[in-house]
């Protein structure tokens, strides 16, 4: 079983989604997890303990294990991510330029089959729609929406 498969099986078995996995040259293993209700420190601790056990049993070499939430600007990698975050503001970078542009920022539309839609502003207030597939994407991330106004 490959490392990604092993980690994904463990994480999903605990009721979480594996968002991303990074392995650095210095032996650090970074795991990003999520769930609809969000991730707490207790969730990260629970997954860390289970992964430490699994990685030891499977004799996987690593120096340090870090488990965290993907953050406010979480990456979107699977079609399910694009479905879940439809209506959110995102930044999408395409592998190849379209109309002389690779990076787009706009409102994500729910996928229609394999096609994902992004409503963006082309020229001073002129709305346009970009249609693309997962294969077209170099990277896609949520744009953090933070409200610093106090609630009264």
UniProtKB/Swiss-Prot annotation:
<keyword id="KW-0963">Cytoplasm</keyword>
<comment type="function">
    <text>Required for maturation of 30S ribosomal subunits.</text>
</comment>
<dbReference type="Pfam" id="PF17384">
    <property type="entry name" value="DUF150_C"/>
</dbReference>
<dbReference type="InterPro" id="IPR028989">
    <property type="entry name" value="RimP_N"/>
</dbReference>
<dbReference type="GO" id="GO:0000028">
    <property type="term" value="P:ribosomal small subunit assembly"/>
</dbReference>
<keyword id="KW-0690">Ribosome biogenesis</keyword>
<comment type="similarity">
    <text>Belongs to the RimP family.</text>
</comment>
<protein>
    <recommendedName>
        <fullName>Ribosome maturation factor RimP</fullName>
    </recommendedName>
</protein>
<dbReference type="InterPro" id="IPR035956">
    <property type="entry name" value="RimP_N_sf"/>
</dbReference>
<dbReference type="GO" id="GO:0006412">
    <property type="term" value="P:translation"/>
</dbReference>
<dbReference type="GO" id="GO:0005829">
    <property type="term" value="C:cytosol"/>
</dbReference>
<dbReference type="Pfam" id="PF02576">
    <property type="entry name" value="RimP_N"/>
</dbReference>
<dbReference type="InterPro" id="IPR028998">
    <property type="entry name" value="RimP_C"/>
</dbReference>
<dbReference type="InterPro" id="IPR036847">
    <property type="entry name" value="RimP_C_sf"/>
</dbReference>
<dbReference type="InterPro" id="IPR003728">
    <property type="entry name" value="Ribosome_maturation_RimP"/>
</dbReference>
